Amino acid sequence: MLNIPIIANSKRFLFSKDHEAQSTRDHDVELETREGPSSGYNPNFNAADAILKKNSDQVDLDVNKLTNVTSRVLNTPEASLIYDDDREFPDGGLKAWLVVFGAFMGLVPVFGLINSLGAIESYISKHQLANISSSTISWIFSLYLAISFLSCILSGGYFDRNGSIGLMCTGTVIYAGGLFALANCKSVWQFILAFSVCSGLGTGILMTPLIGTVATWFLKRRGIATSISTMGGSIGGIVFPIMLRKLYKEVGFQWAIRILSFICLTCLICASVLARERTKPVVQPFKSKAEVAKWYISSVFNWRYFLEGKFLFVAIGASFAESSLTSCATYLASYSMTRGNTENVAYTMITASNAVGILGRYIPGYFADKFIGRFNVEIITISMAALFNFVMWLPFGGNTKVLWAYVCLWGFSTGSILSLTPVCIGQISKTTDFGKRYATVYLLQALVTIPVLPIGGTLIGKGTVANYNHFIIFNSALMAAGAACYIISRHICVGAKLCKF
């Protein structure tokens, strides 16, 4: 069969076929699509059922045997062979922006806590786990991030088939339960069980529907819409460290975490109400439990995605860049205090990086949609982050003024990593496959994240300046490798030419 990404209705195409020793011939053919169940948000289209007809006779063509095929739609210039039909997406309106607001509220705790790990790590390393080594403590946060990304695979296929509401409710209960349990933790295994496993699992389950619902409402403005929704992570990263620092002193660790848990629970309830997909998926019921199991196993991890070079290098690039980002954010406060700054200054630096990150999400997202393109912006910002690590943090981290400048510039340049990664994935994917592809990327990221923080903790060791410099070099190299992978993916898609992409 000829596999065409999107054909909304029957159209007339002119195909030029050049295969083997046959002469070039023009065939006036009609493409039809049979209506059938779909796994996502183009419910009336099934690419596998596309049929070529010539002179009212069905023509069965093997797409692998066709070369030099060109096509044009006759008398329908608005139709195009692209992954998604932009006429299906509102790209605005009250309902669409309420979904963005709902995703924003949900990402305040989900991404906000990831951006605030330093506020928790720096406290427990000096109190509950004061006698535990940095490399051991790092496993708490490494496993939290790994489980967060790994559990995305549980929600990707489910979201494509069933929508968001079940995932939102389940993720909210698990996430909030883990945070409430965190308040009573005193040993490493308790922190791992409550925070790493429970809250991490809830984070991963929530991540896909919060990002995915926005993708079902926007196409042309998807970059800016996703950037606005992920600003919730920056808001959480601003508020949570300041709030925790104050509450640690006034009410202690237990009630500080409980108050944080109530705030996160409220935000997630709001998100569950507002963040809904545009249309309910139209799916074919499963005939047996074996079919259910087979489908979910195949949707959890589809290794065939990695056969696409453009997808493979986006996945690797995102994994390297986000692992570097979370590792640096986790140890930034501890590094600042090692350099002689007070705890107040260290926590304020975390807040400052997240505050500037708001601009780092919005401005790149705007330029990505309007002028430069999503991949181009992602390459520029990731490269800037690596450069700032090498030329500011590494040689001049002991100078408080330079460190402040670095924190602000780094916060801006890394702001788009979390916001534009799903947009770049969506740009090379059909919306019907977005959940599974997004989850597959984060499966790879989980595998990368598991060793990154422990390696960082081992490099830091006793916390000397020389040890931290080794840590900085390691994370800078990861960030640079992430930029290189995005460049390779872009080259696979459009080559070396300068264009909006």
From Swiss-Prot:
It comes from the Eukaryota. It is found in: Membrane. Keywords: Glycoprotein, Isopeptide bond, Membrane, Symport, Transmembrane, Transmembrane helix, Transport, Ubl conjugation. CDD domains: MFS_MCT_SLC16 (cd17352). One of its GO terms (biological process) is riboflavin transport. Residues 1-97, 158-163, 211-222, 275-310, 366-371, 427-438, 494-501 are cytoplasmic. Residues 121-134, 184-187, 246-254, 334-342, 395-403, 462-470 are extracellular. The keyword Cell inner membrane does not apply. Glycans are attached at N131. InterPro entries: MFS, MFS_dom, MFS_trans_sf, Proton-linked_MCT. The keyword Zinc-finger does not apply. GO terms for molecular function: symporter activity; transmembrane transporter activity. Probable transporter. Does not act in the transport of monocarboxylic acids across the plasma membrane. This is Probable transporter MCH4.
